[in-house]
Design a protein with these regions (language model features):
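Extended, charged low-complexity segments
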Residues: 193-255
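Alpha-helical solenoid scaffolds in large eukaryotic transport, assembly, and signaling factors
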Residues: 11-74, 84-99, 121-129
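Eukaryote-skewed repeat-based solenoidal scaffolds used as protein-protein interaction platforms
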Residues: 74-76, 80, 84-202, 208
């Protein structure tokens, strides 16, 4: 009998020593944290989140860490709670709102009055990190298969353009079954909307915000960046719903 794809994956940290971590911006010690995560150390996971997504900010090390995070998230050799955390981290990194410059300063995503994103100076680690997640996320989706889990919805919300069809089927099943927790249903509804290529306008963003009182309060208070397109806002809301589904209200401020 053939093993599931996630069991057939190679060593998730293969090639880790070939990356010059100490030479990368914010890269010192990332290799050891990845090893700790692979061994099931949740403290190492928390440290990775802080290092690779510091206050919603990615860096050179973030982009280089993505292939290893993907393999951790796709491998059944890694404990399930670590896989979940890593997949959520990948989704959050793809949605990051800021990036570190070569001088260690933060540059944030900004939009003009027409809601077109303004260019950033190189190196643009926001774009590089998102591209890295998009490139390898299909490996995670393949490994998760039809699992009806929040981390799958979070990743689908973050990079819907690379999610295979079966993920939309999973999202549809969760959203309309009427048997799943509310936050997971909310996340699945957002994922399905994005996976079907539906347009998000301000009305849809407001409707999406109804899923949680804190999200609605933040939206009505104008706490999202000026001129941010509603599609981005919907993604951020959907990610929060998925995270709440997995970890509850006590973790609402994550990322």
């Amino acid at each position: 009998m053939d093993l599931p794809p996630a069991w057939r994956r190679p060593d998730p940290l293969r090639g880790l020593d070939k990356v010059p971590w100490t030479e990368l911006c914010r890269g010192r010690g990332v290799d050891e944290l990845l090893r700790g995560a692979a061994d099931g150390d949740l403290t190492a996971c928390a440290a990775l989140e802080q290092r690779l997504l510091d206050d919603d900010t990615v860096s050179e090390a973030s982009a280089h860490a993505v292939p290893f995070l993907v393999e951790l998230g796709a491998s059944y050799k890694v404990p399930g709670d670590v896989r979940d955390r890593v997949i959520f981290l990948l989704a959050a990194m793809a949605l990051a709102g800021a990036g570190f410059t070569a001088e260690g300063k933060r540059t944030r995503r900004r939009w003009n009055s027409l809601r077109r994103e303004l260019p950033r100076l190189e190196p643009d680690w926001i774009t590089e990190t998102r591209y890295a997640v998009e490139k390898d996320a299909p490996k995670v989706f393949e490994a998760l298969g039809g699992a009806e889990v929040a981390c799958s919805m979070a990743l689908a919300i973050a990079v819907p353009e690379v999610a295979p069809k079966h993920v939309a089927d999973v999202a549809h099943g969760i959203a309309f079954a009427g048997t799943f927790p509310q936050m997971l249903e909310e996340a699945a509804s957002v994922a399905l909307h994005l996976l079907q290529g539906e347009q998000s306008d301000d009305v849809w963003a407001y409707v999406t915000a109804q899923g949680h009182p804190d999200v609605l309060r933040a939206y009505e208070a104008g706490e999202y960046p000026p001129n941010q397109p509603p599609g981005v806002t919907v993604q951020l809301m959907g990610y929060r719903y998925a995270f709440l589904a997995a970890y509850g209200d006590s973790a609402f401020d994550h990322g």
